[in-house]
Amino acid sequence: MADKIFTFFLILSSISPLLCSSLISPLNLSLIRQANVLISLKQSFDSYDPSLDSWNIPNFNSLCSWTGVSCDNLNQSITRLDLSNLNISGTISPEISRLSPSLVFLDISSNSFSGELPKEIYELSGLEVLNISSNVFEGELETRGFSQMTQLVTLDAYDNSFNGSLPLSLTTLTRLEHLDLGGNYFDGEIPRSYGSFLSLKFLSLSGNDLRGRIPNELANITTLVQLYLGYYNDYRGGIPADFGRLINLVHLDLANCSLKGSIPAELGNLKNLEVLFLQTNELTGSVPRELGNMTSLKTLDLSNNFLEGEIPLELSGLQKLQLFNLFFNRLHGEIPEFVSELPDLQILKLWHNNFTGKIPSKLGSNGNLIEIDLSTNKLTGLIPESLCFGRRLKILILFNNFLFGPLPEDLGQCEPLWRFRLGQNFLTSKLPKGLIYLPNLSLLELQNNFLTGEIPEEEAGNAQFSSLTQINLSNNRLSGPIPGSIRNLRSLQILLLGANRLSGQIPGEIGSLKSLLKIDMSRNNFSGKFPPEFGDCMSLTYLDLSHNQISGQIPVQISQIRILNYLNVSWNSFNQSLPNELGYMKSLTSADFSHNNFSGSVPTSGQFSYFNNTSFLGNPFLCGFSSNPCNGSQNQSQSQLLNQNNARSRGEISAKFKLFFGLGLLGFFLVFVVLAVVKNRRMRKNNPNLWKLIGFQKLGFRSEHILECVKENHVIGKGGRGIVYKGVMPNGEEVAVKKLLTITKGSSHDNGLAAEIQTLGRIRHRNIVRLLAFCSNKDVNLLVYEYMPNGSLGEVLHGKAGVFLKWETRLQIALEAAKGLCYLHHDCSPLIIHRDVKSNNILLGPEFEAHVADFGLAKFMMQDNGASECMSSIAGSYGYIAPEYAYTLRIDEKSDVYSFGVVLLELITGRKPVDNFGEEGIDIVQWSKIQTNCNRQGVVKIIDQRLSNIPLAEAMELFFVAMLCVQEHSVERPTMREVVQMISQAKQPNTF
């Protein structure tokens, strides 16, 4: 009321001169009325872009130039209101209906509007375009509301939190051409009446919770140009054959929505279709030859299904094809030669099938290929010379085949090349000149082949611009020295040259590679000295020089590497004493000095006391370990040194005690000050009026109801990120309330957290715990989630919940949790890295369906807590942490993949990540590898003994996926999208 009175006086003060002169024109009155409506709208906003400061009553004469406002030239009525991307939060005032009937365009997309869509919106009878996408609107869309909006042409409600059934009144809108209801929580079936749209060209219902069959009636909308029905809907049945009647269709997307059955041959009637997405379903049968009639097709993706048979030759009619994806199916036969003759083909991905024969000899000759992935098949023969004919090739992946012969020399001049993975083949010949030094190459894998010759020296000097981060040439027959030009690979992080025939002195130039994380030069013929320049590789964490002929001593400069945790120099010819300085490397947890000619005594300092006896065996002149103790005089001198150190330590302790005592008195005084401040803030915190509640869907409770849950007797869990309480709202809804660790007061991170929570609140996926609301004041942040009655996977597997998970339930949990992570990694923009994937963060619903929880919060714990706490928050939990974190202190989505692999091993074995595995210091990953020898058939040795009648093929496949996920090198791990694909295909017969 006060706001309205204030607005009235503003209007009065601005027009009082006009009143006095009796000169108010109808035009001015209209402008004032419309300005008043916009001011009412602005007052309902909680926050907005500063550009909306132009909206003020004294400025009413320039109403039509206000931000986002457009008018007609005749009577200055507002016809368009565009408030998109203005950082607006809050609600929409009912006053908006007063802009009818002149308003024809309303766009409020990409903001943070919340609450229900006001019914007054439906009163905008002249509206032609309504775009409310990418907000946080909730509740149901009125069944009859849209029937008033008879002029509507475009309705875009994508990416909100609407729920309930799809609104039926939309079918009465005869002018409607564009309808997007995707990215919401609509449930139930698609109404058959949706087939009665008269003018519809664009229909998207993807990304909801729709069930049932796709109605055949949709085929009656023959005006359709684009149709999107996939992504996380869960349909029964298959693709309606009647869709072959949608002759105007250009884009058909039915991906990832549980479709079964065969691909209808009738789809071949869609002559205008340019994009067909059917990937990630459960489609069976063969690829219909009739698809070759879709002569306009540019994109065909049938990947991650259960398709069988051969690639039909009739697909040669797809002369406009640019993307051809058939990967992760059960296809066999040869790759037809016509594939290499498709003139516009850019992306070809046929990996993980059973293709045999040769790669088409002319592949790449069209000059347009950008990406080729034919890995994990049974291909033989030579690699075609023409792959990079057009100098556009960026990705070449052919690993795990039976290819032989030389590498095409032309690949050494393929400058766009970014990823090059040809390991696990039978390739011979030398490395093409220039290949290692290509300017854009990031990953080079040629391990496990029969390559010969020397590693080429860079002649042109272009390597200084190299992007190469990983080289794997291990297990070949390469010979000669490492070229000095390796110093120019400044971005190199991983250098794997083990199991070759390389010789000569290891070049000191390697010390200039400051980004190196791992070096493996074991099992070669290197001689000469250990280069002291290695000590300049300050990021190095792994160094293996074993099984060579290196002599001299280990340079003390190595001790400068503060994060080195693995050092292996065994089976060489080192012949001097072990440097004491190595003992001061607290990071060094594993070292092997065995089978050399080291002399003297083993240092007793620092880390040397932790190394096993086997680390020193085979050194006849070395004493000081259990198998070869030193003589008495040596022991006596060591004892005297120890006494001197103890005396020095006592003096240091005395000085430190005085310092700490003084600091303690100061701290005691500060405690009283802090307690007084805390007491004052607690009094303020208990006032619900200071709390702000942001809902991400329709809420049946208020902030005071949430605060009632935050009591000690409601605690159901405590962790590194806060305390979790269970609560029951007035409407009977059960919720979980997470109280986050206290954020630094006045920190600039507060706004960052609030903004991130807004992003997390918009995430919608059936396998992700739904964030219902965010409740906060200046001191405390509370997250309100849907409650999961069966607790966490960790509690069920390892706790005392009294629940035993059958194998089929475990496999289903694995698949559903993978889908949740896949959504975070691949379908969120920007992608979200979980940062703490573990079994305790996978919650189980009433039917034991998996929901990923606690995602996206760790980086705020990093920002707002001390360094000691942030380490665990960022990296994850003990037993789940990817090995590269130890030396990079950075994580990415592949870190999540590693952690998920650990969860899979928990599901298979029923054991904790860190358990009693019979040997100190090993975890579930190491134990599983030891027990099975990394062989999938060995899964029977580690399977949970409580399980019976397990499908052997399923267990083997799930273990295979787990082993891929926990690969030591992150680049070798699959993406979560690939993990979903592999687990989806794991279900097989044959039990044991």
Swiss-Prot record:
Report the residue ranges that make up the Protein kinase domain in this protein.
710-992
Where do the LRR repeats start and stop? 75-99, 100-124, 126-148, 150-173, 174-199, 201-221, 246-270, 271-294, 296-320, 322-342, 343-366, 368-391, 393-414, 415-438, 439-462, 465-489, 491-513, 514-536, 537-561, 563-585, 586-610
Task: Identify the residue ranges that face the Cytoplasmic compartment according to the record.
Answer: 678-992
Instruction: Give the enzyme class.
Output: transferase
Sugar attachment sites: 28, 75, 87, 131, 163, 220, 256, 293, 354, 440, 472, 525, 568, 575, 597, 613, 631, 635
Q: Does the keyword Repeat apply?
A: yes
Task: Give residues annotated as binding ATP.
Answer: I716, G717, K718, G719, G720, R721, G722, I723, V724, K738
Extract the signal peptide range: 1-21
Topology in the lipid bilayer is annotated as: Single-pass type I membrane protein
Q: Which sequence ranges are listed under topological domain Extracellular?
A: 22-656
Q: Please give the GO cellular component terms listed in this UniProt entry.
A: endoplasmic reticulum membrane; plasma membrane
Please, which domain of life does this record's source organism belong to?
A: Eukaryota
Induced by what?
A: Accumulates upon CLE45 peptide application. Accumulation is promoted by CRN, especially at later stages of protophloem development.
Transmembrane ranges?
657-677
The residue numbers the entry assigns to motif CLE45 peptide binding are 226-231
Keyword annotations of the record: ATP-binding, Cell membrane, Developmental protein, Differentiation, Disulfide bond, Endoplasmic reticulum, Glycoprotein, Kinase, Leucine-rich repeat, Membrane, Nucleotide-binding, Receptor, Repeat, Serine/threonine-protein kinase, Signal, Transferase, Transmembrane, Transmembrane helix
E.C. number? 2.7.11.1
Q: What is the effect of changing T150I?
A: Insensitivity to root growth inhibition mediated by CLE45 peptide
Give the family this protein belongs to, as stated in its UniProt record: Belongs to the protein kinase superfamily. Ser/Thr protein kinase family.
Describe the function of this protein.
Necessary for male gametophyte development, as well as ovule specification and function. Required for the development of high-ordered vascular strands within the leaf and a correlated control of leaf shape, size and symmetry. LRR-rich receptor-like kinase (LRR-RLK) involved in the perception of CLE45 peptide ligand which mediates root growth inhibition by repressing protophloem differentiation; this mechanism requires CRN.
The protein's matches in PANTHER family, at most eight in alphabetical order, are given as: PROTEIN KINASE DOMAIN-CONTAINING PROTEIN (PTHR45974:SF260), RECEPTOR-LIKE PROTEIN 55 (PTHR45974)
Q: What is this protein called?
A: Leucine-rich repeat receptor-like serine/threonine-protein kinase BAM3
Organism source for this protein? Arabidopsis thaliana
Q: Which gene encodes it?
A: BAM3
